[in-house]
Amino acid sequence: MSIKSDRWIRKMAEEHGMIEPFEAGQVRFNDAGERLVSYGTSSYGYDVRCAPEFKVFTNVHSVIVDPKNFDEKSFIDIIGDECIIPPNSFALARTMEYFRIPRDVLTICLGKSTYARCGIIVNVTPLEPEWEGHVTLEFSNTTNLPARIYAGEGVAQMLFFQSDADDVCETSYKDRGGKYQGQRGVTLPRT
């Protein structure tokens, strides 16, 4: 398996719809010239943006967090250009980008250092071969202060690893009917 470069990422996005919408270069400023947390194609990855829809965890209803029987009342929905995450809490969001991962590719997501250096950690499981959808992002605020997340700006980087031609997986995410296949919007746990 080898990591793929900006040339490969551009080709796969432009010719095969791997990432939509797609930004061929790095965007660091908005139209008004104000600095952004960068997004778009980098040397060996793609920096994704957060969409303006969030689910912020709340304990108002005092429900038990159970991944097999998750209660939607555990979240407050927020739509907007930013989201405030309470201290020592978390929020779910999604990428603006929709992904279509090829059968011979595994994609790993890492949080951007701009957020990590503020105590905001991004967690995403790998995007498996032939998975497609919006990526659900989990932001953990590890600080004892409120933390701000910006929609429309970079939040995480996707790294693409392509298998050797003789070592493509036998069973893809699509083949096994993965429960998050084709997800749109912020997706809560499923069993």
UniProtKB/Swiss-Prot annotation:
One of its GO terms (molecular function) is nucleotide binding. It comes from the Bacteria. GO terms for biological process: dUMP biosynthetic process; dUTP biosynthetic process; nucleobase-containing small molecule interconversion. InterPro entries: dCTP_deaminase (IPR011962), dUTPase-like_sf (IPR036157), dUTPase_trimeric (IPR033704). Its EC number is 3.5.4.13. Keywords: Hydrolase, Nucleotide metabolism, Nucleotide-binding. PANTHER family: DCTP DEAMINASE. This is dCTP deaminase. It comes from Psychrobacter arcticus (strain DSM 17307 / VKM B-2377 / 273-4). The lineage of its organism: Bacteria, Pseudomonadati, Pseudomonadota, Gammaproteobacteria, Moraxellales.
